[in-house]
Amino acid sequence: MPMTTSTPARGRRVALLACTALATAVATVAGAPGAARAQAQPPAPTGGAARPRQQPPAPGTPKELRLPTKRVLTLDNGMHVVLVPFGTVPRAYVQLAVRTGMIDEARDGTGLSQLTATMLDQGTATRDARRIADEAATMGGSVSASAGADVTNISGEVLTEHAAPFVTLVADLTRNPSFPADQFARVRTDAIRRRAIAMSQPGEIARERFRAVMYGDHPYARLYASEAELQAYTPERVRAFHAANFGARRATLYVVGQFDAAAVERAAREAFASWSAGSAPTVNPPKAKNARSLTLLDRPGAVQSTINLGVPVPDPSSADYTALEVTDALLGGSFGSRITSNIREQKGYTYSPFSQVSTRVRDAYWAETADVTTDKTGASLTEIFGEVDRLRREAPSAQELRGIQNYVAGIFTLRNGSRGGVASQLQFLDVHGLPDSYLTGYVGRVMATSPEDVRRIAESYLAPERMTLVVVGDKKTVEAQVAPFARTTP
C-alpha cells in the first residue's frame, strides 16, 4: 500500500499489531486463512425452538479514495507548496519535505543526514532550542525533524489559527539552523548511545547486514555509522551537509487540515521566496544484489535466531506494484498471511514474523523477517521458502484472496484518514513521480488483482534462488541447519 520511504522493521511490526483487529475482522468475514471462524452465539431459549444461528453481515464493497481538493503553488525558486483543506477538527498538519537523506551521504558520512535533521530544532540565528519548543507548544503542538533514505521531513501539528506562524517557524529551522556546538555535542552523544542500543539487538544487526549485502557500496547499504565515525563528526561537517543538500528545488511544503489558506500562502511566500534554489534532488538507483547469498552472524548462546531474507522487486512506478503489495499481504505481510499462519500458528516456531515491500526512489525490495526458536532455524527456512514456492506454483483461491484484498483496501483507507496520513500519501506520489490517480484508483487495482496475478507476481519476482539471506544466531547450533540454504538451483 502506498507509503513514503521505507520504515524500520520495528515500525512495521507496530503497524501490524495496530491493525490486528481489522485484519481479524476482515479475514473472518471473507474467509482468509488463519482467521478465527468461531462466532459467539447467544444462549438458546429455555423453552421452544432454538433461535436461528446469527451470521455477520456480508462485507461491503471497498470504496475508492476521494482525494481532498488540493491547491499546488510553485514559487519562483522552484519550491512547491501544497494546500489541502481536510476534515473538521480545528488543527493543521504542516510538513516540509526536503529531498535529501542517506542518498546524499558520502562513504565517510554515514548518519550525517539524521544528525543534520536532529540539529534543525536545536537553534537558529534568532531562536534557541528552548524558544523553538516554547513557540511550538504555544501554538498547540510541537516540531520534529527526521531523515530517511531520500527525504528529510520537518513537521508538526498545531491549532488552526497558528498554521501560518508555524509555517514561518518551520522555515526558520530549515533555512537558518545555527548548529550550536553545545547542542551538537549532546545530539552526537545521543546518536552514539542509540547506535550502541541498536547493535545489541539482533533484529537491527540482521537488518544492517541485509542492507549491506543487498546494496554493496551504495549509500542505501549503510544504516549505522561506527562509533569512531560519529565521534569524528563536528558542527562544521553537519553545516556543510546542510549547505550542500537543502534548497528550494528539493523542497515541498504540505499543509493539511483546517487553516486560513490565504494566510498560509502569504506566510509560505514570505518565508521561502528568498531561499536559494540549490541543486536538484539526487537520483541514484542502486544495483541491488540479485543472487542467493547466505550470511551467518554468530550470537553465542542465543535462544532465538533472527532471519532476514529478501529480493529486489519493482518499485512503485511499475504497473505490477499494487499486485505485488497484495501478494506480500497474502504471503507474509498480514496476520492472516500464509507464512505467519504456518510458522506462528501451526508450527509455533516464532511469535511475530512479517514481510514487507520496502521502497526508496527507483528501488524496492521484498523481505521476510522472523525471530525463530534456535533449534527450528532450518525448519523455519524450509517452511518460508516452501510457502514462497507454493505460491509461485499455485494461485490462491478466490476466497482467500478476497480476504486479503479487503484487508489491504481497509488499511489503505485507514492511512488516509488523518491529516498526517494525507500528507504522507501526497509525498509518496511526489517522491515516486506518480499521478493523483495512483491513489484514487488504488482500491480498484487491489480488488481487480486476480488469483493468477498473485501467482504470476510471486513467480516473476520472488524467486528463492535470487534471495539474500541473513541469519543472526548461535553459530554452533545454527550453522549446520542453515548450510543447505547457502546455494540453490533454479
Regions found by a protein language model. Give the residues of each.
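Acidic/histidine-enriched alpha-helical segments
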Residues: 133-138, 178-196, 260, 279-292, ...
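M16/insulysin-pitrilysin zinc metalloprotease superfamily fold
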Residues: 122-126, 156-188, 334, 354, ...
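An aromatic/glycine/proline-enriched structural segment found at the starts
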Residues: 42-58, 217, 252-315, 471-490
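Scaffold signal of the M16-like zinc-metallopeptidase fold and its non-catalytic homologs
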Residues: 44-55, 166, 198-247, 268, ...
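Signal peptide processing junction and immediate N-terminal pro/mature segment
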Residues: 27-44
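M16/MPP (pitrilysin/insulinase) zinc-metallopeptidase core fold and M16-derived inactive scaffolds
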Residues: 93-160, 200, 222-224, 334-349, ...
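C-terminal regions of mature proteins
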Residues: 39-63, 252-255, 370, 402-490
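Mature N-terminal segment immediately following signal peptide/propeptide cleavage
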Residues: 59-97
